[in-house]
Amino acid sequence: MKIELAKKETVHFIGIGGIGMSGLSLVMKRKGFKVQGSDVSNNKNVERLKKEKIKIFIGHSKKNLKNATIIVISSAIKKNNPELIEAQKKKIPVIKRGKMLASIVSLLKNIVVVGSHGKTTTTSLITSIFQETKLDPTIINGGVINSIKNTAKLGKSDWSILEADESDGSFIHILPTYSIITNIDREHMDFYKSMDDLKNYFLNFIKKTPSFGKSFICIDDKINRELLKKIKFKNFYTYGLRSNSNFKIKNIKQFKSYSKFDIKVSLPNTKIHNIKNIKIPLIGTHNIRNSVGALGVALSVGIPIQKIKNGLKNFQGVQRRFNKIFSYNNIDFYDDYAHHPTEIKVVLEGVKNVYHEYDKVCIFQPHRISRLKDLKKDFTYAFKNADSVILCPIYTAGEKIKLGFSYENFAKEIIKNSKVKLFMVENFPRLVKFLKNNMYGKKIVIGMGAGSISNWMRELPKLM
């Protein structure tokens, strides 16, 4: 599909309110495409798009495709979606989000962030660095970047900063100039046939890096290290805590609202060997790694080190990544997107490092039955750095499959393996009641999950 011809088409996004779909549709609209879409319900992303004069249908119906000539779908769209069925019946071209994204940015110099965890924060950190320069990149992210108050922005330069979604393998269609591979974990196994299949997708993506580009690979990740052994070309740099990293993290100091660290740089033909006193308004070793990946790319692009440090220091954050929502009885309540065992573990680890004298309370809402079934054992060990867990009902995201095991026994396994106190709540009103009766003393509360838990956290201040 040629982009010049596509501007004459009407592009319909099924599930336009999704975080990745909303960003892509916004950029296409601002590029001059005719854009419309549908979603099952209204949300903040839909409201942002409506302000851009994008026509949005609430509810999925074949009638919504009346003027559509191209359909864009994400991995969240099921085969029985009535609009997808109608598009196939009418032989309207159906394109995956990742492939459409690749087409839109095919003529740009792309900085592409991939990996199982940390993509959104890393993409946002790169954006913050670029904002210290006169470069004006196009940005498409998987979360709302606070400094631009949106998930996406159409820039005027030939640079783009992209978060690429690995859930359906379509990230493989994007041609990176520079890329960051944060980590690779067992996830989206409904698409990937095996872990080897997942690894090969990432390996093939890395191999697409042109000779004039660079891949930045976090060497602290075990699977990343496996892939490094299979890469024959040398246009990649590594970053992390390990001694053989090209960008080695040193002298970490973490506080309640920020972290400081140094980097030892080991690169051929460079005048920069040590970068000291880097400050980021984030906690957690995982976020330090994310910022070093962003720094490495920015250096390769040619951004001066002081501007890079300023961009990291001035980072305004991204929504749903350890955001403070409110305080109650002098207890701070945070919201975080963590919904995979690894994400839960690293967030709680970061919190424990700086809030060691506090009781750490995690309100957890599992997201998708399929994920819980696939990673059940890992979930039971994920809460070791918490003191207590409030377990909410599963947010199914429309899945109609059976859990296949007792949810109560799952809760007992969390108590046993993570060594925490655990309380189960049946619904949001019960959660409110529990919190009102039990939140006192020296505590910190983090709501975690990718479903409705974020809305719950924002409703709590009105009800407590």
Language-model segments: which ranges?
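Conserved N-terminal Rossmann-fold NAD(P)-binding element of oxidoreductases
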Residues: 11-16, 448
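Beta-strand->loop->alpha-helix junctions that form or flank phosphate-binding loops
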Residues: 38-39, 57-60, 95-102, 140, ...
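Nucleotide phosphate-binding/pyrophosphate-handling subdomain across enzymes
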Residues: 2-12, 20, 24-31, 180, ...
